[in-house]
Amino acid sequence: MGAQIRVYRQKISSTTSMRKIFKAMELIATSRIGKARARVAASLPYANAITRAVSAVASQSEIDHPLVTEPEQIRRAAVLVITSDRGLAGSYSASVLKQAEGLTELLREEGKEVKTYVVGRKAQAYFDFRNRPYAQVWTGNTDSPVFATAQEIGAALLEDFATAYEEGGVDEIHVVYTRFKSMVTQEPTVIRLLPLEVVEEQAASESDLLPLYEFEPETEQVLDALLPRYIESRIFAAMLQAAASELAARQRAMKSAGDNATDLIKKYTRLRNTARQAEITQELSEIVAGADALNAS
């Protein structure tokens, strides 16, 4: 009986230590998510402005630019999957990877080859474990993205988009990430970057009119200059949304883990007390039995 009590004491001690870790991680995620949400909000004006500019240039020009023209046949598609570097965030990365798998299956059903690019160690480990190839990987700052990484990703994707199919190039580019809606709602999302599609949320309302531009230099040169920046801003915006979603998911996961730890501590405390009461009862019974035996003799 005493050994059982010691086991419960050890479980209470270890669970209490784990609860402290969960609480610390919850507080860290809570403190960082405010900054992450602010970065998401700060990125929107630039993303909206450059989207309108590119939309205006594309809609008012009649040039056959590869970045805005739908190809006759799409044979290979690039899929950029944005996950996290670290775990302890519930089903955050698993949900994104499930969405990416669904997109990959859909593209293959349409007869397209898929070339995968990954952001985050979780996606890297997922594909490595299954011995599935990926073109490039970026890791190290998924919960605090930097624009330089978005520029590097954008340059790699644009280079492959400009490369011929026979040389390993792609005909369209998709991004799979988690859109941050609120602290309790984050949604795995797929967007197509190229050929150019204006995202509905960033498009101008029907009452707004696109500005009329007089292009200097030529329209094609304007698109050549604008579109790389447009792609970089869209990728960076997706990374910021994913970072806020990751922190929100981690905060919820750590709070849930802490609550579960509290429940376990209560359970082990109750079992320990029950075992202690049983031990005391047994000792009293033995004392009474011994006293009765002495009296009988």
UniProtKB/Swiss-Prot annotation:
Pfam families reported in the protein's UniProt record: ATP-synt
Xref: InterPro entries: ATP_synth_F1_ATPase_gsu, ATP_synth_F1_gsu, ATP_synth_F1_gsu_CS
Keywords: ATP synthesis, Cell membrane, CF(1), Hydrogen ion transport, Ion transport, Membrane, Transport
Topology versus the membrane: Peripheral membrane protein
SUPFAM superfamilies hit by this protein: ATP synthase (F1-ATPase), gamma subunit
GO biological processes: proton motive force-driven plasma membrane ATP synthesis
Compartments in which it is found: Cell membrane
Disulfide bonds listed in the record: none
Keyword Cytoplasm among UniProt keywords: no
GO cellular component terms attached to this protein's record: plasma membrane; proton-transporting ATP synthase complex
GO molecular function: ATP binding; proton-transporting ATP synthase activity, rotational mechanism
Free-text function comment from the UniProt entry: Produces ATP from ADP in the presence of a proton gradient across the membrane. The gamma chain is believed to be important in regulating ATPase activity and the flow of protons through the CF(0) complex.
HAMAP family: ATP_synth_gamma_bact
UniProt similarity note: Belongs to the ATPase gamma chain family.
PANTHER family: ATP SYNTHASE GAMMA CHAIN (PTHR11693), ATP SYNTHASE SUBUNIT GAMMA, MITOCHONDRIAL (PTHR11693:SF22)
Assembly description: F-type ATPases have 2 components, CF(1) - the catalytic core - and CF(0) - the membrane proton channel. CF(1) has five subunits: alpha(3), beta(3), gamma(1), delta(1), epsilon(1). CF(0) has three main subunits: a, b and c.
Protein name: ATP synthase gamma chain
Species name: Arthrobacter sp. (strain FB24)
